[in-house]
Swiss-Prot record:
Consists of two distinct domains, a catalytic core and a N-terminal extension that is involved in tRNA binding. ATP binds at residues 258-260, 274, 345-348. It catalyses: tRNA(Ser) + L-serine + ATP = L-seryl-tRNA(Ser) + AMP + diphosphate + H(+); tRNA(Sec) + L-serine + ATP = L-seryl-tRNA(Sec) + AMP + diphosphate + H(+). The gene is serS. One of its GO terms (molecular function) is serine-tRNA ligase activity. It comes from the Bacteria. This is Serine--tRNA ligase. It comes from Rhodococcus opacus (strain B4). Keywords: Aminoacyl-tRNA synthetase, ATP-binding, Cytoplasm, Ligase, Nucleotide-binding, Protein biosynthesis. Belongs to the class-II aminoacyl-tRNA synthetase family. Type-1 seryl-tRNA synthetase subfamily. Catalyzes the attachment of serine to tRNA(Ser). Is also able to aminoacylate tRNA(Sec) with serine, to form the misacylated tRNA L-seryl-tRNA(Sec), which will be further converted into selenocysteinyl-tRNA(Sec). It is found in: Cytoplasm. Disulfide bonds: none annotated. Its EC number is 6.1.1.11. The lineage of its organism: Bacteria, Bacillati, Actinomycetota, Actinomycetes, Mycobacteriales. Coiled coil: none annotated.
Length: 418
C-alpha cells in the first residue's frame, strides 16, 4: 500500500502515477475521501469516549437523587459510543478497500505507456549469424532427448512438460550455478513453502487485477506461488528488522505455478510459457533510501548470470502500464531467440519501495530507534525459460548444442548430442 501521508501531501503525484500506469486517477480522490471519513470517524469516536469518561465521573459524584437521571443519560451515551465504534470500523474497512485499489507510485524516470513502450537501456552480445536454418528450442529439445511435451500433456494437460536426461541436468546446473553466485554475493539460500496463506499473497500484491493467474486450493484456502518472492516477502511479516548493517538478502529456489489464464493462444509451443517451472529468485529487504542502489545491484547480479550462459540480450526499462501493482520501477533482461527473431524476457527485477512491506507490516528501526516501513526488491537469477535461449543460441549445424562453459561442470558434458 502507498503511504497515506505522502498521498495527503502529494495527491497530484499519485494521480500522475495512476495515469502513467493507465489506471484510473479518480481512485486517488476516492482514497482521499475514505481517508478523511475514517479520520473524522476516529475523532468522533474519541470525543464521545472522552465525554463518556467525564460523564462517568459525574455519575460517581452525583447524589442519590441525581443518579437515576444521570444513569439514563449514561446509557444513551454508551449507545452513541457503540454506534460511533461501528461507524469507525465501517470507515476503516472502506479505507482499506480504497487503499488496496491504488497501485504503487511509479518512480520518476520510468517510461509511460504499455507493454510496447519500454526503453532499451543497453544491448549486449552478438546475435548469432547461423550458416544453416536454426531449429527452435522444442525441436532441439525433442531431438536431443531433453524435453518431452507430449507426455507432459498426457500426464497433466497443456503447457506441462518433462525435462529429461541432460535437459534436467541443464536446468539443475543452471539453478545450482545461480545459487552459488547468490551465496557468493551475500544472499542466504532458502527453499521456501510454495503454498501460502491469503494474507501473504495479498500482501505482496498478487491478489489484485491478475488474481485469476494464481492457483487456489479452495478447501485449504492456500495459494500456489508464481514466484518465491511471495513466501520470502512473508518471511519477515509483522517483524521489526535490524538493517543497521545493510540489506537482508535471500535467494529462494522453488517450483512456481501460473495459470496463464490471460495467455490463451500465446506461446503454445514449447516451454516459454508454462504452468509449472523452477526458479532462483533474489529478494531484498532494505531501508527506503538504499532501494535504488540495491535495485542496480540486483540488475548487475542478473547480468552476471546471463554472461555465464553466454547469450545475447538487452536491458529494458519497463513502462508504467506494464508494471505489476507492487512495483515502482522494473528492469527486464530479454535474451535473443533466433527462431522468433525477437527478444524474450529472461529476468525481471522490481523495486517495490515500501508498498509490500507496508501491507505485510515489515519494519526496521531508524537511527533514532523509531520503527519505519522497510523497502523490498526482487529479481530473477535463473529460471526454466533460460533453457530456450541456451538451446537456440548455442545450437550447431549438426543438430547438437554447445553447453555454456560455466555450466559444463554441472551438466557433465560440453555438448548435447542425440
Amino acid at each position: 500500500m502507498i503511504d497515506l501521508k505522502f498521498l495527503r501531501e502529494n495527491p497530484d503525484a499519485v494521480r500522475e502515477s495512476q495515469r502513467t500506469r493507465g489506471e484510473d486517477p479518480a481512485l486517488v480522490d476516492a482514497l482521499l475521501e475514505a481517508d478523511a471519513s475514517r479520520r473524522a470517524a476516529v475523532l468522533a469516536g474519541d470525543n464521545l469516549r472522552a465525554e463518556q469518561k467525564a460523564f462517568g465521573k459525574k455519575v460517581g459524584q452525583a447524589s442519590p437523587e441525581e443518579r437515576p437521571a444521570l444513569l439514563e443519560g449514561s446509557k444513551e451515551l454508551a449507545a452513541k459510543v457503540k454506534q460511533a465504534e461501528a461507524g469507525q470500523h465501517e470507515a476503516q474497512a472502506a479505507l482499506d478497500a480504497a487503499h488496496r485499489a491504488i497501485s504503487n507510485i511509479v518512480q520518476d524516470g520510468a517510461p509511460a505507456g504499455g507493454e510496447d513502450d519500454f526503453i532499451t537501456l543497453e544491448t549486449v552480445g552478438e546475435i548469432p549469424a547461423f550458416d544453416f536454418e536454426p531449429k527452435d528450442h522444442l525441436e532441439l529439445g525433442e531431438s536431443l532427448g531433453l524435453i518431452d511435451m507430449e507426455r507432459g500433456a498426457k500426464v497433466s494437460g497443456a503447457r506441462f512438460y518433462f525435462l529429461t536426461g541432460f535437459g534436467a541436468m541443464l536446468q539443475l546446473g543452471m539453478l545450482q550455478l545461480a545459487a552459488q553466485k547468490a551465496m557468493a554475493n551475500g544472499f542466504q539460500m532458502m527453499i521456501p513453502p510454495v503454498l501460502v496463506r491469503p494474507e501473504i499473497m495479498a500482501g505482496t500484491g498478487f491478489l489484485g487485477a491478475h488474481s485469476d493467474e494464481i492457483y487456489h486450493l479452495a478447501d485449504d484456502d492456500l495459494y500456489l506461488v508464481g514466484t518465491s518472492e511471495v513466501p520470502l516477502a512473508g518471511y519477515h511479516s509483522g517483524e521489526i528488522l535490524d538493517l543497521a548493517d545493510g540489506p537482508k538478502r535471500y535467494a529462494g529456489w522453488s517450483t512456481c505455478f501460473r495459470r496463464e489464464a490471460g495467455s490463451y493462444g500465446k506461446d503454445t509451443r514449447g516451454i516459454i510459457r508454462v504452468h509449472q517451472f523452477d526458479k532462483v529468485e533474489m529478494f531484498t529487504y532494505c531501508k527506503p533510501e538504499d532501494a535504488d542502489a540495491e535495485h542496480q545491484r540486483l540488475l548487475a547480479w542478473e547480468r552476471d548470470m546471463l554472461a555465464a550462459i553466454d547469450v545475447p540480450y538487452r536491458v529494458i526499462d519497463v513502462a508504467g502500464g506494464d508494471l505489476g501493482s507492487s512495483a515502482a520501477r522494473k528492469f527486464d533482461c530479454e535474451a535473443w531467440v533466433p527462431t522468433q527473431q525477437a527478444y524474450r524476457e529472461l529476468t525481471s527485477t522490481s523495486n517495490c519501495t515500501t508498498f509490500q512491506a507496508r501491507r505485510l507490516g515489515v519494519r526496521y528501526r531508524d537511527e533514532n530507534g523509531k520503527p519505519q516501513t522497510a523497502a523490498t526488491l526482487n529479481g530473477t537469477l535463473a529460471t526454466t525459460r533460460w533453457i530456450v535461449a541456451i538451446l537456440e543460441n548455442h545450437q550447431q549445424s549438426d543438430g547438437t548444442v554447445r553447453v555454456p562453459e560455466a555450466l559444463v561442470p554441472f551438466v557433465g558434458t560440453d555438448v548435447l548430442k542425440p
